[in-house]
């Protein structure tokens, strides 16, 4: 799930715009759930029009959290920020994010698995070797998931995935909102994935944190905006999803 949610290796610039975006062609299937691959989604956005990715780079320092579920959510958002910084070719931001990923991974007990990847990310960013940075970010996600599953922390692994999906959706809707198109909005048509996350959150009653409840409530708000059958997702719905995910993104990175 983690690799599927965060793999943001992007298509070449200047490719021909697609006649129509078919979300199923930009997806993989995880646990019988169609998971749109962000590398394909962001590549499709590039094809639909130029994107100023530097506007979406976020490198603010986060507060120190002690709750492992909170750290897992934050780790997901920071890994997603890493892919966005790569797309913007912002070497200082990528190097900073590499260090933050390592610190957060240590906070949930998987730092040893991430250390070599963090070093490789920083080295590749120094050389502006963006293909290698993407590859190491992808390996980071896989290592996080594998390490968590080995110690039966699957729920934390799911929160990492959720954090990344929320951040990716925040950026996706921000881009589409600025230059609305039906094809861009169609990239939000992910009702099965939303249901997947809702189901997983319902099974996390032991994580009794305000941010978890806020996300649960927010997903209820988002669902009718994107679960619309064969209809088109409207510009107003894109705006609302952006407002919701932006609010959650701010809540994830700040103290309660």
Regions found by a protein language model. Give the residues of each.
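Bacterial N-terminal signal peptides
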Residues: 1-9
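Boundary at the C-terminal end of the N-terminal hydrophobic targeting segment
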Residues: 12-14
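N-terminal Sec/ER secretory leader and immediately downstream segment
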Residues: 16-121
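Long, amphipathic, charge-rich alpha-helical segments that form helical bundles/coiled-coils
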Residues: 69-80, 101-108, 112, 161, ...
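Secondary-structure edge/capping motif, primarily at the C-terminal ends of alpha-helices
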Residues: 82-89, 108, 112, 147-151, ...
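Short, charged, amphipathic alpha-helical segments
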Residues: 95-99, 119-120, 159-162, 184-189, ...
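Extended amphipathic alpha-helical interaction segments
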Residues: 124-206
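A cross-kingdom marker for long, charged
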Residues: 206-256
């Amino acid at each position: 799930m983690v690799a599927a949610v965060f793999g943001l290796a992007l298509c070449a610039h200047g490719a021909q715009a697609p006649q129509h975006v078919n979300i199923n062609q930009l997806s993989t299937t995880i646990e019988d759930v169609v998971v749109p691959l962000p590398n394909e989604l962001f590549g499709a956005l590039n094809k639909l029009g130029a994107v100023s990715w530097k506007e979406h780079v976020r490198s603010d320092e986060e507060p120190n959290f002690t709750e492992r579920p909170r750290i897992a959510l934050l780790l997901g958002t920071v890994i997603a920020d890493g892919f966005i910084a790569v797309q913007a070719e912002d070497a200082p931001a990528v190097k900073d994010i590499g260090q933050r990923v390592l610190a957060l991974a240590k906070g949930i007990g998987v730092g040893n698995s991430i250390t070599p990847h963090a070093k490789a990310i920083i080295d590749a960013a120094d050389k502006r070797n963006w293909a290698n940075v993407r590859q190491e970010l992808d390996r980071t996600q896989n290592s996080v998931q594998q390490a968590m599953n080995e110690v039966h922390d699957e729920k934390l692994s799911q929160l990492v995935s959720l954090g990344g999906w929320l951040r990716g959706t925040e950026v996706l809707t921000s881009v589409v909102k600025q230059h609305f198109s039906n094809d861009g909005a169609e990239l939000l048509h992910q009702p099965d994935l939303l249901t997947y996350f809702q189901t997983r959150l319902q099974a996390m009653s032991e994580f009794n944190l305000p941010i978890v409840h806020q996300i649960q409530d927010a997903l209820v708000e988002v669902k009718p905006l994107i679960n619309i059958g064969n209809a088109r997702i409207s510009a107003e719905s894109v705006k609302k999803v952006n407002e919701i995910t932006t609010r959650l993104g701010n809540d994830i990175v700040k103290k309660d």
